[in-house]
Amino acid sequence: MNKILVAYDGGDPARRALETAAELAKLTGASVAVVSVVPTHPGRFPVDPSDDTSVHAQELLEARRMLREKGIEAELIEPTGDPAPTIERIADEGGYDTVVIGSRGLNAMGRILQGSVSEHVATHSKATVVVAR
């Protein structure tokens, strides 16, 4: 394990993913990057992605602070797009061998209606995917 990508959105599942990534990095000496995707919202009305940028920037800074408290430096990545395929693309193009992502614990209906980012990444990424619960 050389490169860990952790998906982070500030929620409790993402915090658990960050903790898991920190533990793995300490055990293996792997480098860590944190990605927080600014989602684009398809629909009838255009949404300005810059509206979400400051929120995601704050989430990334929070993640960096949490990792620094554990003695880990991290690269911060803030792309825009659909979160699931964007995380998958960054992991694959960046050569990350491990992706750590939180699980929201959606029930079957929630997965059908909303989709599951962790399920998509685990199914499609070339990297090993660790789902923190």
Regions found by a protein language model. Name each.
Residues 41-42, 84, 108:
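Generic structural signal for helix capping and beta-alpha/helix-loop junctions
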Residues 89-133:
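Gly/Ser-rich helix-loop-strand patches that form or flank binding pockets
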Residues 2-50, 70-72:
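Small/aliphatic-rich secondary-structure junction motif
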Residues 50-61:
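Short, surface-exposed alpha-helical segments at coil->helix boundaries
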Residues 61-68:
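Class I S-adenosyl-L-methionine
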Residues 17, 21, 63, 87, ...:
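Aromatic/hydrophobic pocket-lining residues that form π-stacking "cages" and hydrophobic walls in ligand
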Residues 33, 75, 130:
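Conserved beta-strand positions in the Rossmann-like core of class I SAM-dependent methyltransferases
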Residues 68-99:
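Structural beta-alpha unit
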